[in-house]
């Protein structure tokens, strides 16, 4: 068993692994400095064992912050669960420094419990469960100031020490960019015996500043051989609740997600509106999908395409 990494550990993938000043005196120094040994991560075998009953995994990615990845993740999970009552769904919040799912899913103040099989995720509905570092903090205002190795260790624990049980689909809410969290979760799930079930969905807003980073995320998935189910354009338009007119709050100067999808050969799953009801539901944690509205109409088509991609 490897000892916990020191506070300023450069990480096993770094050129300084086992050689940096922080490595002096670390019991893992010999493992990290040996190019053969450092590739052997005992945590990977634990992840494979823990995830053996999780049929499919779906990464919710963007590259850009503020486009609504977490909101879209919660909406997808709840709509999928409501429209597939005989299936089981899980949500894993791997945005370690900015966990949003406890609030979005109406689970603020909940805590996880240890069982003989590991951490028990928090039940949201009969067929939806959630795990987030937000459940492990003393206060919602606590800041998490961690370097890469500690984040990676936390993600490994979420994948190997949470009792997910039998899930038809696990949705993973990710932070912006292609950082430690992304590399860590992909490295573990691609080593899963059912790695073919790992796919990704991109979330973007219509403006080019968002699309620029989504293109990078698409290329990240291509380099990692992760199939992309498609792209969701969030906040695509706004319909006034008084006059009923529709306007573009974020104009698509370069054609928005449809043009990017055509350019890169990626399916467009659909568009979600900028909806005041979504904003209110995010703050209160209530389930918006139990009501018929413009958002749930859009979710119906998006979710059917996602489920079809795994069949």
UniProtKB/Swiss-Prot annotation:
Residues 1-21 are annotated as: Disordered. Its main location: cytoplasm. Keywords: 4Fe-4S, ATP-binding, Cytoplasm, Iron, Iron-sulfur, Metal-binding, Nucleotide-binding. GO terms for cellular component: cytosol. One of its GO terms (biological process) is iron-sulfur cluster assembly. Heterotetramer of 2 Nubp1 and 2 Nubp2 chains. Gene3D superfamilies: P-loop containing nucleotide triphosphate hydrolases. Its cofactor is [4Fe-4S] cluster. ATP binds at residues 63-70. It comes from the Eukaryota. It comes from Drosophila sechellia (Fruit fly). Belongs to the Mrp/NBP35 ATP-binding proteins family. NUBP1/NBP35 subfamily. Binds 4 [4Fe-4S] clusters per heterotetramer. Contains two stable clusters in the N-termini of Nubp1 and two labile, bridging clusters between subunits of the Nubp1-Nubp2 heterotetramer. The keyword Metal-binding applies. Pfam families: ParA. SMART domains: AAA. It is found in: Cytoplasm. This is Cytosolic Fe-S cluster assembly factor Nubp1 homolog. [4Fe-4S] cluster 1 binds at residues 9, 23, 26, 32. [4Fe-4S] cluster 2 binds at residues 240, 243. Component of the cytosolic iron-sulfur (Fe/S) protein assembly (CIA) machinery. Required for maturation of extramitochondrial Fe-S proteins. The Nubp1-Nubp2 heterotetramer forms a Fe-S scaffold complex, mediating the de novo assembly of an Fe-S cluster and its transfer to target apoproteins. One of its GO terms (molecular function) is ATP hydrolysis activity.
């Amino acid at each position: 068993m490897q000892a916990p990494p020191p506070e300023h550990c450069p990480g096993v993938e770094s050129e300084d692994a086992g050689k940096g000043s922080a490595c002096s005196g670390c019991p893992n120094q010999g493992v990290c400095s040996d190019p053969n040994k450092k590739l052997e991560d005992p945590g990977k075998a634990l992840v494979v064992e823990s995830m053996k009953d999780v049929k499919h995994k779906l990464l919710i990615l963007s590259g850009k912050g503020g486009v609504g990845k977490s909101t879209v993740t919660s909406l997808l999970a709840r709509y999928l669960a409501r429209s597939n009552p005989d299936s089981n769904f899980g949500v894993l919040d791997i945005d370690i420094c900015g966990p949003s799912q406890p609030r979005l899913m109406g689970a603020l103040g909940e805590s996880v419990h240890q069982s003989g099989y590991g951490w028990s995720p928090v039940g949201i509905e009969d067929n939806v469960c959630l795990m987030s570092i937000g459940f492990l903090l003393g206060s919602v205002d606590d800041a998490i100031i961690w370097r890469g190795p500690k984040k990676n260790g936390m993600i490994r624990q979420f994948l190997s020490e949470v009792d997910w049980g039998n899930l038809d689909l696990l949705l993973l809410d990710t932070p912006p960019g292609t950082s430690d969290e992304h590399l860590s979760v992909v490295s573990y799930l691609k080593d899963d015996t059912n790695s073919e079930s790992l796919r990704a969905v991109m979330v973007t807003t219509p403006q080019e500043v968002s699309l620029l980073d989504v293109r990078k995320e698409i290329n990240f998935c291509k380099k990692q051989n992760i199939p992309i189910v498609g792209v969701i354009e969030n906040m695509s338009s706004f319909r006034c609740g008084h006059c009923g007119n529709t306007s573009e709050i974020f104009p698509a100067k370069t054609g928005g997600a449809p043009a990017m999808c055509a350019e890169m050969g990626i399916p467009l799953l659909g568009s979600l509106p900028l909806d005041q009801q979504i904003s209110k539901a995010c703050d209160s944690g209530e389930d918006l999908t139990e009501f018929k509205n413009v958002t749930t109409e859009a979710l119906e088509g998006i979710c059917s395409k996602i489920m079809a991609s795994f069949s």
